[in-house]
Amino acid sequence: MDKIIVITSNIAPYRKEWCEELAKFYDVTIVYTKDHDYERDDRWLQKESKTCRILKLKNDKDRFDALCFDVIDVIRDNKDALIVFDGYGPKTNLLGLLYCRLKGRFSLVNVDGYPTERKKSFLKETVKRFVIGKLCTGFTASGEATKEHLLSYGAKEDRIIVHNFSSIREKQIAGRPYSREEKLEIRKKLGIQSEKQIVLGVGRFLPLKRFEDLIDAVLMCKTAPDLYLLGGKPEASYLKHAGDSDRIHFIDFVLPEQVDDYYRAADLFVLPSETDVWGLVLNEAMAQGLPLIASDSVVGARSLIRENGKIFRTYDVKELSEDIDLCLEKDNHQKMSAESLDIVRDFTIENMVRRQKPFIDAYFEREKRK
């Protein structure tokens, strides 16, 4: 069986799922550099797999930017394997990319998206152009917007696979939108007493997520929905913006397998980030039939939001509030819910691998002919 080595910083649940789908067709080893992530709960990370081998590189500091020199040993000892780097930013990945380039060895870089930065450093842009245009030899890209971004930095179009990035499997997609009665029943299970329409936000409570904008927008809405923010202990700024309102609710960390019930209980999902390289929570919300609203700084919104929601200008609280009211209007809501389910069926882990497999198989065929 042909071998693939995936080199990543840590093993996110969706990364493991993707590797395990690849493992149906290839011999896959996941090589990672750190056991912890200061921005995430350790319970979220994955360290075991039934179908992939897992190898930890030496990293005494357990940092994202640590330089693990033994990545060279892994690449050198697996001469027949296709090397796949999860991103081009980590130092260990850059070292591995440089080694592959010096040895004339093809590798793939998986690119989930890109930061939508408003201020750009000349030095950083120059280095990025060199890495993408000269150092990397092939890419798997999360969507068309990511592909265009890579092309703008010098990547070759015939070396890019667009795979419709996702964290969900086909079996996780609801067969139809949930009814009002079903949502109320799920709310009881979660201990939610509200019978109002619910707007949901999911993600780490970080400044760049702009959840304070969502709080302000919900409090301005004519439809007066409740807001549930799921992702940790609320920031002081969130509590200040919420004031004494009984419509704003904060939920601490929830395991991935429990989050779906919150999607099912809600009526609308909003991601107001000031930058987001993709936004996998959009995929997850769509899989449960939710309409979406996201800022124009969320890269995934450009692929996922069509007639199933709205994209608003980042930081524009008034526009966000108006969009929430529009999406919660009964006729719009029903149409958008059905549209979300139609769109997301093309964004699954199975489809990611289906799109990647012809490119990967062609690579191994070329190598065998040498």
What residues fall within each predicted segment?
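A short, histidine- and acid-enriched strand-loop-helix "catalytic/donor-clamping" loop
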Residues: 105-123, 135-138, 169
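Donor nucleotide-sugar binding/catalytic pocket of nucleotide-sugar-dependent glycosyltransferases
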Residues: 136-184
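Conserved donor-binding/catalytic core segment of Leloir-type glycosyltransferases
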Residues: 193-209, 215-218
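Nucleotide-activated donor-binding/catalytic signature segment of Leloir-type glycosyltransferases, i.e.
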Residues: 237-254
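Short alpha-helical donor nucleotide-sugar binding micro-motif in glycosyltransferases
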Residues: 253-254, 261-266
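Aromatic "clamp/platform" in nucleotide-sugar-dependent glycosyltransferases that forms part
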Residues: 274
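Short hydrophobic beta-strand element within catalytic cores of glycosyltransferases
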Residues: 291-295
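Conserved acidic donor-binding segment of nucleotide-sugar-dependent glycosyltransferases
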Residues: 306-317, 325-331
